[in-house]
């Protein structure tokens, strides 16, 4: 079989993920997000650096969700998501428990990151926090998910 394959192109750089698809199409596994951040994918980094957002982390093993927000106070979406890649929990109480009991490999295998709503840097942080609360209430993530507050 191998002798029938033809090499058409050799890439000048190693493949490091897809191009930025637009905020409404972001749905990334932990390893995809990690690759984007560690390789400093310019299209992605530029898009996330100055963006505020309400985002969703989904545990695909059990369907539990965590709703969070990225505001100026916490360094926008790139900084917020970089925190999750660094330790698996980003400082969140319930996510810390998962990393503590199941390990970082669990997060790497089962966590998925997406954007529910995105905003430019000028949007008032208080509005974003209100939208975060609305999503928590709508998705019942305090009762059935990983949100503590």
In which residue ranges do the predicted regions lie?
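GIY-YIG nuclease catalytic motif and its immediate N-terminal context
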Residues: 1-67, 71
């Amino acid at each position: 079989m191998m002798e029938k394959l033809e090499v058409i192109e050799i890439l000048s750089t190693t493949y490091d993920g897809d191009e930025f698809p637009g905020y409404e199409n972001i749905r990334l596994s932990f390893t995809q997000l990690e690759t984007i951040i560690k390789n400093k994918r310019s299209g992605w980094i530029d898009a996330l650096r100055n963006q505020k957002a309400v985002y969703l982390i989904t545990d695909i093993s059990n369907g539990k969700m965590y709703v969070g927000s990225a505001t100026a106070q916490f360094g926008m979406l790139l900084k917020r998501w970089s925190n999750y890649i660094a330790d698996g929990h980003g400082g969140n109480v319930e996510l810390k428990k998962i990393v503590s009991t199941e390990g970082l490999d669990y997060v790497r295998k089962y966590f998925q990151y997406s954007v529910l709503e995105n905003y430019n840097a000028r949007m008032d942080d208080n509005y974003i926090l209100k939208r975060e609360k609305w999503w928590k209430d709508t998705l019942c993530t305090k009762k059935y998910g990983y949100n503590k507050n």
